Regions:
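Catalytic-core regions of core metabolic enzymes
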Residues: 1-299
Length: 299
C-alpha cells in the first residue's frame, strides 16, 4: 500500500504542452508504471491532439470523463495556475498536485476560499498538494512531479517535507542505507498551500505499510508545531524530525515564500524544541536524518 497514489492511479497533466509539462511528463511516464498511469493532458487550444501518445482534451472535466482519471498534476505558469487548480476541483478529482511556483497569494486565497465553500455546501473534497512543491512518489510504482525517480527505493519509511531538495536528501540517505520508502511527499513552501504536515502524518500513521517517518520542516508558520502536538497524542510510529533555517535571521525570507520568521515560535529552534517535547528524534544536522531513522527502527 501507499498514501495518496499507487500503480493504479490515473493522472491528467494540466499544462502538458508547455516545455516544463512535456519534460516532466516524459520523466514520469518513463518511471515504473508511468506508461499506464499518465492517461490525459489538458489544453483548451489543442484538444484532439496528443503528446507522445497521450491524448489532449479541452478541459479536466472532459479528460476525466474519457479516461476515468482521479488525479491531476499542474505545470501551468503562475498567472493561470490557480484557475487550473480550481478546474481540477470543479471536476471533482480526488487529488490535484500543483508544481508551479510564484502563484500570486491573492489567487491562492481565492481558490482556498472557493474550495472551502464547495466543501461546506456538501460538494466533493479535492485534496491539494502544493503549490510550489515537487509532488509525490510511491517508489517503484508511480511518481507524479519533478523528483528524481532513481534515488528512491521501495520500502516502509514515509518522508514528508516542505522542501523539495531536502526530501531528495532524506530519500537518498535512506536508500544508501538500504532502507526503502513507502511514499515521499513534498507539501511545498508557499504560505497558502493544501495538505499540511499534520494531514500527511495522519495518512502515514494510518498506513499499514509505513513503519516510521522522517518529517522535514523549515522556519515560518505554525505547521510543524501543530503536527508535532498531534503526533504526541496520536502517532504510533517513530518520527525523525529536522527543521531547516537554524541560522536564519528574523524578517528575512529564506528561499520559499513561507520561510519567513515573523515571531518567536516561527524559528527553527522553537520548532525543534516542540518536536523534542513531543517525542520526535530530532537532529540539527540534515546529514544525520537517515542514520537516526535507521537507529529508530532498530536495523
Amino acid at each position: 500500500m501507499s498514501i495518496l497514489i499507487n500503480k493504479d492511479t490515473r493522472v491528467i497533466t494540466q499544462g502538458i504542452t508547455g516545455k516544463t509539462g512535456q519534460f516532466h511528463t516524459r520523466m514520469c511516464v518513463a518511471y515504473a508504471n508511468g506508461k499506464n498511469c499518465f492517461v490525459a493532458g489538458v489544453n483548451p487550444k489543442k484538444a484532439g491532439e496528443d503528446f507522445e501518445g497521450i491524448p489532449i482534451y479541452a478541459s479536466v472535466k472532459d479528460a476525466k470523463a474519457q479516461t476515468g482519471a482521479s488525479v491531476s498534476v499542474i505545470y501551468v505558469p503562475p498567472p493561470g495556475a490557480a484557475a487550473a487548480i480550481w478546474e481540477a476541483v470543479e471536476a471533482d478529482l480526488d487529488l490535484a498536485i500543483c508544481i508551479t511556483e510564484g502563484i500570486p497569494i491573492r489567487d491562492m486565497l481565492e481558490v482556498r476560499n472557493k474550495m472551502k465553500a464547495k466543501e461546506a455546501a456538501g460538494g466533493k473534497k479535492t485534496l491539494l498538494l502544493g503549490p510550489n512543491c515537487p509532488g509525490t512518489i510511491t517508489p517503484e510504482e508511480i511518481k507524479i512531479g519533478i523528483m528524481p525517480g532513481h534515488i528512491h527505493k521501495k520500502g516502509r519509511v514515509g518522508v514528508v517535507s516542505r522542501s523539495g531538495t531536502l526530501t531528495y536528501e532524506a530519500v537518498a540517505q535512506l536508500s544508501e542505507l538500504g532502507i526503502g520508502q513507502s511514499s515521499a511527499v513534498g507539501i511545498g513552501g508557499d504560505p497558502i498551500n493544501g495538505l499540511k504536515h499534520i494531514d500527511v502524518m495522519r495518512l502515514f500513521n494510518d498506513d499499514p505499510d509505513t513503519d516510521a517517518v522522517i518529517m522535514i520542516g523549515e522556519i515560518g508558520g505554525p505547521d510543524e508545531a501543530e503536527a508535532a502536538r498531534w503526533c504526541k497524542a496520536n502517532m504510533k510510529k517513530p518520527v525523525v524530525g529536522f527543521i531547516a533555517g537554524v541560522t536564519a535571521p528574523p524578517g528575512k525570507r529564506m528561499g520559499h515564500a513561507g520561510a519567513l520568521i515573523s515571531g518567536g515560535a516561527d524559528t527553527a529552534e522553537a520548532k525543534l524544541a516542540v518536536m523534542e517535547e513531543c517525542g520526535f528524534i530530532v537532529t540539527r544536522n540534515p546529514s544525520e536524518m537517515g542514520r537516526l531513522l535507521k537507529k529508530a527502527i532498530g536495523i
